[in-house]
Amino acid sequence: MIEKLRTDGPDYNRCLVNLSNSILKRFGAETSADTLKSADEYLAKGHRNVVVLLLDAMGTSILEKHLAEDGFFRSNLRDTFSSVYPPTTVAATTSILSGLYPNEHGWLGWDIYFPQLDKNVTAFTNTVQMTEKEGATPNVMNKDHEFEWGTDSLNEPAPASEQSAAFTYLPYKNIVDRINEAGGSAFPSMRFLPPFPDSFEKVLDRIKQLCDEPGEKFIYAYWDEPDHTMHRTGTVSTASHDVIVSMEEKVKELASKLSDTLLIVTADHSHMDSRNLCILDYPEVTDCLVRLPSLEPRTLNFYVKDEYKDSFSEIFKKNFGDDFLLLTRKEVLEEKLFGIGTDREGLSDMIGDYVALAVSDVSIFNTHYEAQVMPGGHAGLTAEEFAIPLIVAER
């Protein structure tokens, strides 16, 4: 079954890391990996403005589900390339922002185990991983007379550390800073950095404003849709469709107003409809664990008690069958699951005794509430989750 990793896993020679290094090369900054040839072709034309707009989870399969072939996005689709592993926002956006593979930058998933703190930490919020209250029960009945889990079943999020654990223990220099330090000019347009545009329209307005200014420049822009909506409603919901169609129209309008600009639209990963389980319903598995799994519901990082290390593989397969590919730490490192760069110091300490990779539509959450409210997912080992578009508009 490990052959599935080799055939369906990421293409680390044609992925987000390579696109990032194409940008670095174009603006005279030092590269750390090969470039993406399909992007180099357009970058070589010397447009005054180069914009990379990353739309979270707007993968190739999502374009095909929702948008017309002759629409702006699909008619300008120049290539389909690969996310990284796991195909998820923390790992993938850090790869495009750093030009590094996940095994180099260490931002491996939504919840990362930090041995320095001996905690599973939600990287972006710097809180201890979400957990369920001991003895929690569902307390709301829906219209179908089914019990639902409320947020009152969850423990209050607690700060993991005084300073960001991820930036403290896994620092990296982003490509905007690297280009500026190399003598180029680069700017972000995302809600997390000044001037903190807090809507998609404001992100696009900032792109237009920067492109109108004189001089050669690179702009990296990011927005968290359609990922946010698809997590809550699935990939084919009316809500997801409306968001995706609206975003395409707004980007098309922006492109019509630009000049001497290369606009590249891409995604960090794609998205799929998930069949969700909660690991707390499998005590035979949780009894084996030192702590609840980290990383992602479709890439589970297991630290196993000594007395179960030999039997865990059999116990896991008994409960979850062939829905996951279970790898040992040694196999994860030997197979270069997280990238083909040089392993970051301490990487092996962040990887558990076993890592389970989803090869079906099943996801395993640590709380019943999350399993209930997240019908859309990603971060597993299916081709659908990896394939991302290279949309190119020249103006």
What is each stretch, according to the model?
Residues 1-395:
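Feature captures the catalytic ectodomains and active-site-proximal regions of enzymes
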